[in-house]
Amino acid sequence: TRCSRDWSSDVCSSDLLKAAPPPPQQPSSPVYIPFAFTGIKGTPDDFHLPTANSAIIALIEAVVSKEGPISIGLLSRRVAEHWGVSRVTSRALNRVDGLLRRANVKITADDGKVFIWPPSQVPKEYTDFRVPGQDELSKRDAEDLCPIEVANGALYLLEQHVSLPVADLVRETARLFGYARLGQNVDKAMKSGIEVLMWSGRAKEDGGVVVVR
């Protein structure tokens, strides 16, 4: 399959992108609901101690169960904040990364970006996508969107229009996920998802227009 395990890429980014107000919700467009902060469990120094391993693993599983598929960068932020870590550095990211193998989760990667899934989900059979709600934390950075999820959102739009020029599909998919403008990261994330959609055989490009197969 396209997704494969790849631990060589640092997908954590501080390049925050402002999201637009969400589009009107559709029954097939569930809102992305973030994991609720459960309280401080220790200090930033405690986060890196072996004694915190069990608590970190439990939080990994809880966050992934709520938000998966979730990028390793966003997962690390959700987990690390319980130890007062306000900014996820490569050290904190590696801390979570190092415990993933011990957690009951699935791990995939696309173009070097690692995403974590609940054990009950089958990535290649995943057909859902989630849009931002009113909670600020439900508005994900573009690099935290799983390409498979973006592909599903793009397909949802194509099924309404039958076909769209590539540029229009990129723009409308970005809008669906709450982005008012196409910055570099947003554009890249949308195009990556559309590429996954076409690779999956559910759509094709013909003369600059993407058509549902």
Placement of each model-derived feature along the sequence:
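Single conserved hydrophobic/aromatic residue that forms the stacking wall/gate
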Residues: T1-D15
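Acidic, proline-/serine-/threonine-rich low-complexity intrinsically disordered repeat tracts
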Residues: L16-S29
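Charged low-complexity interaction tracts in eukaryotic proteins
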Residues: P27-T51, S90-L145, K188-R213
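Positively charged, polyanion-binding regions of nucleic-acid-associated proteins
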Residues: G42, P50-S71, K139-P165, L176-F177, ...
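A short acidic, leucine-rich amphipathic alpha-helix
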Residues: L75-V79, L169-T173
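Terminal recognition/anchoring or ligand-binding modules at protein termini
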Residues: G178-L182, L197-M198
